[in-house]
Amino acid sequence: MKSYSQFNLNAAAPPAIAYETTVVNPNGSPLDPHQQQQQQSQDMPHFGLPGPQPPSSQQQQQQLQVHHQQQQQQQQQQQQQQHQQQMQMSLLPGPYRPHIEEKKLTRDAMEKYMRERNDMVIVILHAKVAQKSYGNEKRFFCPPPCIYLFGSGWRRRYEEMLQQGEGEQGAQLCAFIGIGSSDQDMQQLDLNGKQYCAAKTLFISDSDKRKHFMLSVKMFYGNGHDIGVFNSKRIKVISKPSKKKQSLKNADLCIASGTNVALFNRLRSQTVSTRYLHVENGHFHASSTQWGAFTIHLLDDNESESEEFQVRDGYIHYGATVKLVCSVTGMALPRLIIRKVDKQMALLEADDPVSQLHKCAFYMKDTDRMYLCLSQEKIIQFQATPCPKEPNKEMINDGACWTIISTDKAEYQFYEGMGPVASPVTPVPIVNSLNLNGGGDVAMLELSGDNFTPHLQVWFGDVEAETMYRCTETLLCVVPEISQFRGEWLWVRQPTQVPISLVRNDGIIYATGLTFTYTPEPGPRPHCNTQAEDVMRARQNNNNNNITSISNNNNSNNAGSPAAGGGLQQQQQQHQALPSISEVQWNSHGSGLS
């Protein structure tokens, strides 16, 4: 059962990291390339028969010129290769980064973090597909990828840098975004004093043969301090929207119920006239600068209008009843029937699957041919005209014709628990699920996700847990005893919930948004001699069979049993509070939502 509020939402280029070997003089100064070559030739012993007679002075001069040209070409090639390596190295994840300086997080520092929660959050919002550009044309990504900064940590870090004597320019955030291709330069983002920025001029050309790609956002401070590289989710490259009747065989181009979409309107196919459906200050409007991600839910045809409604699984087809809900504010539009559009005609009998970048219209259910429409920046109702010769079609205007596209979001959250760190904070580990294994004296928690490294430790609230790194997608840890949180308890007497965090060995805290719940037990558990070290060692030696068999039997759905001693809950963190429910009336034609 879903419940929603109704009808209301000059910096230089980034520094690169490279590794190279330099030959130095005895006094410590580096040799230039010519000196290095001479040094190598002097050190290299020569064996074999004597060579030919030395050439004449004219031949020597010609040979020297050729040799000098070859040296220049080699130096240019080496410089180009080094530049490419530097750009590639700056985008590589953790194992290729410099050594992380250890700065172990203390319990006091974790307690302070849990009290204040000065997180630094980066959200990359983008479309799931991108249309390819051919020849000299540039089909800019629409809607444009957006970067949002949430959390009070950004402002706090800026103020701390100023207090430490850093100038305003050195404390400013700098960001570049690119498509991960060496053929296209990264574009600078303007984040100075703002929490939002859109990359409006990104495109992918037909010379790029990739079928999928990811956006890369490189962030650093004006003083050159590297924050890291943050990647978007995977984006599929398409040539153009399909005009053929879609089938579910191309499921990656279809739109599933419960996924997020963006809607935009482009009058007379002019790029400058593009407006996006968006929610701001509790009202729907058509924005030329920001776009909203709306969850599209499939409803039963007989579902009545209500703030609470039952949703269905499956793919969205034309003619289906849907509900559009803003993914940020929770504001919802009335029940809509999605209809296919062809030459300013809404097709009443089309029933094929809705596909990426299709043009569609939204009929407002149980009204007299009213459609969701825009007029300048307002969202209004438009009454369609019946087609006298074709009763299965209705004529609509440009403002009621919307382009639909699926969207995705990559979110990264971190906090420097022991103060600023020298190494980039990326790769940021992401935890997708938790599985509780075993019970008794030693219960194990298995974390599944991405970007795990051996430098990470699992924390339950302000208690560090024994952690074992398995691979970049799996971590294991020992669940701490309840006495670590409730000193006087020998067993769990009442539900106790603690947040799960990952902490890097230089003090960076990565919140997971997941919690662990200790569930009540009837009494003290019988003591078992099994030690945590033995369990960890046994699991390391038996790393495949053990995990598979146990996780299938004891997954997160039944982990709350008293025998297991704990339970799991996943909570989505929202950065903006949902607005209160308010009564909003629709006005016909010339006015918007009030």
UniProtKB/Swiss-Prot annotation:
SMART domains hit by this protein: BTD, LAG1_DNAbind
Q: Where is the IPT/TIG domain?
A: 429-519
Compartments where located: Nucleus; Cytoplasm
What UniProt keywords are attached to this protein's entry?
A: Activator, Cytoplasm, Developmental protein, DNA-binding, Notch signaling pathway, Nucleus, Repeat, Repressor, Transcription, Transcription regulation
Tell me the Pfam families matching this sequence.
Answer: BTD, LAG1-DNAbind, TIG_SUH
InterPro entries xrefs: Beta-trefoil_DNA-bd_dom (IPR015350), BTD_sf (IPR036358), CLS_fam (IPR040159), Ig-like_fold (IPR013783), Ig_E-set (IPR014756), p53-like_TF_DNA-bd_sf (IPR008967), RBP-J/Cbf11/Cbf12_DNA-bd (IPR015351), RBP-J/Cbf11_DNA-bd_sf (IPR037095)
Q: Which GO terms describe its cellular component?
A: CSL-Notch-Mastermind transcription factor complex; cytoplasm; nucleoplasm; nucleus; polytene chromosome; protein-containing complex; RNA polymerase II transcription repressor complex; transcription repressor complex
Alphabetized Gene3D superfamilies for the sequence: 2.80.10.50, Immunoglobulins (2.60.40.10), LAG1, DNA binding domain (2.60.40.1450)
Q: Where is this region: Disordered?
A: 20-87, 542-594
Q: Which GO terms describe its molecular function?
A: DNA binding; DNA-binding transcription activator activity, RNA polymerase II-specific; DNA-binding transcription factor activity, RNA polymerase II-specific; histone acetyltransferase binding; RNA polymerase II cis-regulatory region sequence-specific DNA binding; RNA polymerase II transcription regulatory region sequence-specific DNA binding; RNA polymerase II-specific DNA-binding transcription factor binding
Q: Where is the composition biased (Polar residues)?
A: 582-594
Biased composition, class Low complexity, residue ranges: 58-87, 542-562, 569-580
What biological-process terms (Gene Ontology) are attached?
asymmetric cell division; cell fate determination; crystal cell differentiation; hemopoiesis; imaginal disc-derived leg morphogenesis; imaginal disc-derived wing vein morphogenesis; long-term memory; negative regulation of compound eye cone cell fate specification
Q: Establish whether keyword Repeat is in the entry.
A: yes
Q: Which PANTHER family match?
A: RECOMBINING BINDING PROTEIN SUPPRESSOR OF HAIRLESS
Q: Oligomeric state and partners?
A: Interacts with activated cleaved Notch. Interacts with Hairless, this interaction preventing its DNA-binding activity. Interacts with insv (via BEN domain).
Report the sequence similarity comment from the record: Belongs to the Su(H) family.
Report the function annotation for this chain. Transcriptional regulator that plays a central role in Notch signaling, a signaling pathway involved in cell-cell communication that regulates a broad spectrum of cell-fate determinations. Binds directly the 5'-GTGRGAR-3' DNA consensus sequence, which is present in the regulatory region of several genes. Acts as a transcriptional repressor when it is not associated with Notch proteins. When associated with some Notch protein, it acts as a transcriptional activator that activates transcription of Notch target genes. Required for transcription of Sim.
Recorded protein name is Suppressor of hairless protein
Tell me which species this is from.
Drosophila melanogaster
